[in-house]
Amino acid sequence: MLRSVVALLLFATATASVADNPETMAERSQSRAREVLDRAVAANGGAEALRAVKVVRLKLSGKTYPRLQMTTPAAPFEGGSFAETLLVDLEENRLRLEQEFGGFGFDGNNTIAIVDGAGSVYDNRARTITPIPAEQATQQQFIQYHRRLPNLLLRQALNNTNSLRYLGEDQFDGRRHEVVTFVMPDTQQVALYIDAQSGLISKYELIFVDSLTGEEASEIIFGDYQKVGNYQLPRRWQNRLAGEVNADYAAQAEINPAITDDSFRVAAAGYAEVKPVPTNLEEKVEELADGVHVIQNVAGQNQNSLAVGFADYVAVVEAPGSSDGADAVIKRIKELFPGKPIRYVAMTHHHGDHIGGMRSFIAEGATVITTAANRPVIEEMAAAKQNDRLSREPRKPQFLLLENGRRVLEDATRKLELINIGPNPHAREMVIAWLPAEKVVFQGDLFFVPNNDAPFGPPQPSTVSFAKKLRELGLTAERIAAVHGETATIEQFRGATATAD
């Protein structure tokens, strides 16, 4: 009897479902998305042609305008230069990536090669070879490069049709588009904008967390398509973050160029082999002197803050990372200085990775010490809607500005000087912290101690400018602590900058 009742209930439920909803919303969404995808695939030569792509070579070159990483917080901005050549063997999971870039105080010339699950990074400035950890040289890591070209994105969508969903119609660049989304093997959810007329992918979007405004869209825009054989290949490649142009490149793509094993070998005679960069840096507190601590890797990996104790309060220099990371840093500071309020938080410069935790310190009641030009960045950040402590406990930021390039905090126990040493090639306004009694400088992005055993290599333009300023100011530092990396001795710093003298 019980079995009959259960069967009857199941039949009634199924009958009601069929009558009320002959096809679920997810099924309808996937079915519509598949129709749109099939049209895009047909516009790019068809599924057979896309699956016949075995090798891709892509050259990108142009200007970069990295959001919250330029020399000034507001326009007009100075762009950087960038050139990249990517070679991917999709069948054998081989990759070679060459990049050259300049601007914002840094020059780079690197080559990455991955073959048979083993990879290395070749620093062509420092002439070093750094192994890539095995877990980062797997097929999974190749997936990100499928987002470089619309042809490879379509292949991925065809391989992941279960996650296809139709989002609707939208206008982009004055044209109607249908938008579908799918999930790639690296768990990134990608929204494809497919031109309703041509069937070509105009752009795709990812969602990222912006340190200034919270969740935003990252857009990769493809344009100026050219038909080459069966394929439509873009000749323009642009990245926008939060609506701002982040990179603008000319693109040159080749499908199935001839390759050999030598295509993935890197000539590196005379290069030094060094240890891999650790994938998980230890959270720790470094004591530079009584009441002077560098809180390392607590805000995030390779993200440090300086905490300086005074008689009645604590001053912090730098709030990197995120609100969650800053909450963890604040907890450590309270353990180091029980009963003392965090009265001040100073920032070295306006870049996003250096101010991502500022909202938590504002919520804590700390006054922000910065330059006049950087104040609007913090005001905008504090006003943004984010799911963090400041949203739950709203508070307007209070400011203490540098005057004539300096701000000094001092009582009977300690003296801390905040000095604007800009303009620096990395940022026009660049503040360092100087503890004269302890002979310690704390800085951000001006000098790095590698997290492995790699040599320093030729000094970067930002470091050369920093060394010159230290001499001009007569700061007799013995140690140079950093927002990124370990604390350096003055001997290390002098050795690394000797070629710049």
Locate the predicted segments by residue:
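Divalent-metal (often Zn2+) His-rich catalytic cores of metallo-beta-lactamase-fold enzymes
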Residues: A467-D501
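Zn-dependent metallo-beta-lactamase
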Residues: D248-F310, R407
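Flexible, processing/modification-adjacent segments and terminal tails
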Residues: S29-E35, A42, V115-V190, A196-L200, ...
